[in-house]
Amino acid sequence: MATEHEEKLGTEDSKWLGEYSQVHMNVFGTPLRVMDHGQGAHIWDVDGNEYLDFLAGIAVNSLGYAHPKWVKAVADQAAKVAHISNYFASEPQIELASKLVKLAGAPEGSKVYFGNSGAEGNEAALKLAKLYGRTLPGALPSIGGKPARILAMTHGFHGRTMGALSATWKPGIRKPYDPLVPNIEFVRAGDKVALHDAFAQTGLGRYGKGPVAAVILELIQGEAGVQPLGADYVKFVRELCDINHALLIIDEVQTGIGRTGKWFAFQRDDLSGGVTPDMVTFAKGVAGGFPMGGMIAFGEKLAALFTPGSHGSTFAGNPLGAAAGLATLDVIEDENLVANAEARGEQLRDGIMATGNPLFVSVRGRGLLDAVELKHPCSHAVMNYCLEHGLIVNAVAPNALRFAPPLIVTAQDVDQALAILKDVPTDLPDD
């Protein structure tokens, strides 16, 4: 028997999806639905079907949809000035940078670079790391030095632009674009011996490599299935970086801005081991749905390596995006949404296992970045079942579903999601 959603699908979705396929390059596949409007944690498609959104634009819509304070801030700024060139600055841009430095607990002299996406934030971090690498003794041409290296993790994801892609593990999206940026190497995530060996390859001899300028990692590897890297391992990375004068770059594109129950995931000792990074990248949730990303360089000496002309973007830190970012951070503070992320995430994880559904083997995650491990690789079938029953989730891996609800999600919203998850059939087909 068809569900209510199945019966209502068709007319408007079919019309718009047909046109979509005619005018859009096929980089995302066929969209699941054509969406029209949202409110809070709920969104409606063009056929009028309502969905509880437990993906939030992949951890982007921190405040859900149409939060009145966010809408007002963006509208007010648009009525003043939406964009100025980077020959000028704006008050929202300056205020947002100051606030991010403060929330990150970065030391005096730390500075922010704004871009428009997570990939751009990571591009900035990688470029700054390369500039830093040129200052290392083992990389100096005058003594026969070799180009400094950047180490990245297997299964890590940092973006699809050429530099960020060079530090992204997934072979399927890397290989078509070979050769990528040189001197970026992968080490097995969580493997201390492999990391030690990678550092130990530094040397001026015939078989030696250039010094390690930086290590880039995610504390929770989101695209790998919401897999925490491990606090003990991260602490070890920091120790090796310190010994070898290398930078630690923590990619918080998905984990930052309150999502894991702290403003930044590195502020959770159970994820970071209490380490402090040299750079943090951010995006997704920072502006509540407006395209924005960036990087924080910790300390004046590192931040000073970027000089006029060394990096930039036309739209970086534009007033409209900055106003959206300020409104997002203000609402997160005013409504205590960091604590809500912690509480609702615990409710979700505990509730999934309490459903008694034998399809659900285990849960993992922090705050409102979570995953459930499935008994067999049927994540796409589960995702489609949930969608048909009014719940948006993500098939992040064959055996795992990802949840990243807006930070404004309520206990009632979580209960509604759990009621749908409880009834997911156990005999759905494998992907």
Curated annotation (Swiss-Prot):
GO terms for molecular function: identical protein binding; N2-acetyl-L-ornithine:2-oxoglutarate 5-aminotransferase activity; pyridoxal phosphate binding. Keywords: Amino-acid biosynthesis, Aminotransferase, Arginine biosynthesis, Cytoplasm, Pyridoxal phosphate, Transferase. Its main location: cytoplasm. Homodimer. This is Acetylornithine aminotransferase. Belongs to the class-III pyridoxal-phosphate-dependent aminotransferase family. ArgD subfamily. One of its GO terms (biological process) is L-arginine biosynthetic process. May also have succinyldiaminopimelate aminotransferase activity, thus carrying out the corresponding step in lysine biosynthesis. It comes from Bifidobacterium longum (strain NCC 2705). PROSITE patterns: AA_TRANSFER_CLASS_3. Its EC number is 2.6.1.11. N(2)-acetyl-L-ornithine binds at R160, S313. It catalyses: N(2)-acetyl-L-ornithine + 2-oxoglutarate = N-acetyl-L-glutamate 5-semialdehyde + L-glutamate. Pathway: Amino-acid biosynthesis; L-arginine biosynthesis; N(2)-acetyl-L-ornithine from L-glutamate: step 4/4. Binds 1 pyridoxal phosphate per subunit. InterPro entries: AcOrn/SuccOrn_fam, Aminotrans_3, Aminotrans_3_PPA_site, Class-III_PLP-dep_AT, PyrdxlP-dep_Trfase, PyrdxlP-dep_Trfase_major, PyrdxlP-dep_Trfase_small.
